[in-house]
């Protein structure tokens, strides 16, 4: 069966993003963002060096898209779904920083729904869409399930795992050429807010974390 992956984004307001977007940043990726541009997948892999990098590597290994359909798309705060190889510059990243991924953000919701409907048509009926992202809230599932129905799948192994654990799992699967088990998203129920708090990272001083800390949105 054909399979397309949709990935949740990296955090565009995290420590690494702020460091990269400084006017005096001399990093190679910051200079390219000011010039010819950088692919969206590479930018988000830099911002989230474990979780997003693991998602992208996994999707690149196991995507089997139908013809004339991208195999990997990334959810963005302001532009709906974008192929991972889309070239972006600083202005686009600044726009992402201003967007909020939340079901009450009408611009985020309308952009995602619009691009998801287009993807659903491109995919056809014999193709699965696998979400690599948070299952704990409705910010992705509530918007995608009505459009894709039974075609929307999620990794069974993601249920109950934190984002750092997922990143390591995905990279191991790539090394072992081992695919995860996918279940229908219709069977997944978002966790209540108390359970989500219990699963969150216990970080008392986030600003003290080193630059390698994984800035992911889940």
What are these regions (language model features)?
Residues 1-218:
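Peripheral peptide segments
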């Amino acid at each position: 069966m054909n399979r397309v992956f949709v990935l949740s984004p990296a955090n565009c307001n995290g420590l690494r993003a702020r460091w990269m977007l400084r006017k005096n940043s001399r990093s190679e990726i910051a200079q390219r963002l000011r010039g010819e541009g950088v692919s969206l997948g590479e930018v988000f892999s830099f911002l989230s060096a474990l979780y997003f990098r693991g998602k992208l590597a996994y999707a690149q290994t196991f995507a089997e898209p139908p013809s004339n359909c991208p195999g990997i798309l990334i959810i963005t705060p302001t532009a709906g779904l974008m192929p991972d190889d889309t070239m972006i510059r600083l202005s686009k990243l600044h726009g992402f920083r201003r967007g909020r991924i939340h079901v009450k953000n009408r611009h985020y919701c309308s952009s995602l729904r619009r691009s998801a409907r287009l993807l659903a048509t491109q995919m056809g009926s014999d193709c699965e869409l696998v979400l690599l992202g948070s299952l704990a809230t409705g910010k992705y599932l509530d918007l995608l399930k009505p459009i894709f129905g039974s075609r929307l799948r999620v990794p069974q192994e993601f249920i109950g795992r934190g984002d750092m654990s997922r990143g390591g799992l995905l990279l191991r699967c790539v090394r072992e050429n081992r695919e995860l088990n996918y279940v229908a998203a219709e069977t997944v129920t978002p966790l209540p807010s108390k359970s989500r708090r219990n699963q969150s990272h216990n970080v008392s001083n986030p600003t003290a974390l080193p630059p390698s800390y994984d800035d992911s949105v889940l």
